[in-house]
UniProtKB/Swiss-Prot annotation:
Pfam family, one: Glyco_tran_28_C
Protein name, as recorded: UDP-N-acetylglucosamine transferase subunit alg13
Subcellular localization(s) per the UniProt record: Endoplasmic reticulum
Species per Swiss-Prot/TrEMBL record: Aspergillus fumigatus (strain ATCC MYA-4609 / CBS 101355 / FGSC A1100 / Af293)
Record-listed E.C. numbers: 2.4.1.141
Gene Ontology CC annotation, any one: endoplasmic reticulum
Amino acid sequence: MLATKVCFVTVGATASFEELVRAALDPSFVTALEENGYSHLLVQYGKNAVIYENFLKQYPPERRPWRRINISGFSFHEHGLGGDFALAQADISKGRSGGLVISHAGSGTILEVLRMGIPLIVVPNPSLQDNHQEELARQLQKQGYVVASHYQNLCQALHQAEQLRARMLRWPPVRGPDQKNQPTLEQVMSDEMGFVD
């Protein structure tokens, strides 16, 4: 059985972001996902249900040109998106290879995805006033944490996200608040060899 590889797209629950939903469901982007080994595209479309429903009418499962990718969507989950983000997280025991999250540039979403160690494409919503999302996305990309993109450039951003994944593998492991602090190499050597400060 092949491992699943999930691309999860989220627009958040408060503001409409039609352009990102359209771009994520664009045939060229779905094809790019399939070509990069993705098995699932999950779209949290928020207030943009009409766009998703129109996609389903235009591309019912039996008439889709994509045979190796499952496409599904939902409006929002009251319990949050942590479980959906986890679907894009590599977990060999669950048959998942590392996927990707594409998100509006909400700071809460960005922090949660970064904590989970999942490659992230951040797409600021240009319709928001006082667009702090653009500045946040640019700074995080400049520091090498995310891929900042415009919704019209998702195919190119997908390629950049795969490069980001390779760089992330060299990062130290992410420690969540529920994990014990592991001793540093210095602490282990001190304990084993009797070094005293």
